[in-house]
């Protein structure tokens, strides 16, 4: 999300090199949810999500009815509408991540980037958050270190080591004893349940 430039090669968005996009244009197309973070100022849940409309507003332009409607829709999707007047700082870790996801959705992105969004969350909140993401009608590119969660909620996986993609494909194609040995240096047995969840046993 434009924090660093590529050492080599070209990164494109919709066929256009990323450096040719302005920051505002990029923010209209791409939204980001990072690892758990604590904002340093107090805002309500609704105010936080409304920040997602910033790329669509000109300088000093006030939000319109449509902006508030999109915020409400985003809060409904993450099941946080009833808490829209709560202070962000008063929420649990899982609730905060859902609010940040709602803010990203309010941007109306075509691509949603998730950088370890479940880090520091209890397992229930991890499952809740990824289940919400799975149901969204938007392209999602996520960084996850939990292999079994990645298999459960992903359609396509890239398995990387030291910045290089070594394996890619469907979860079943990608997560094998051979790939886990190569990438992580561990021996394992991988079995799959009827609903295509990976069961990994490390030897």
Regions found by a protein language model. Give the residues of each.
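Helix-to-loop junction immediately C-terminal to a conserved catalytic motif
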Residues: 1
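Conserved ABC transporter NBD signature motif
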Residues: 9-17, 26, 86
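Conserved ABC ATPase "signature" region
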Residues: 50, 65-83
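Conserved ABC ATPase signature
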Residues: 87-91, 95
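A short, proline-enriched helix->beta-strand linker immediately N-terminal to the Walker B motif
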Residues: 106-110
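Catalytic Walker B motif of ABC-type/P-loop ATPase nucleotide-binding domains
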Residues: 112-116, 121
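ABC ATPase nucleotide-binding domains
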Residues: 177-178, 182-203
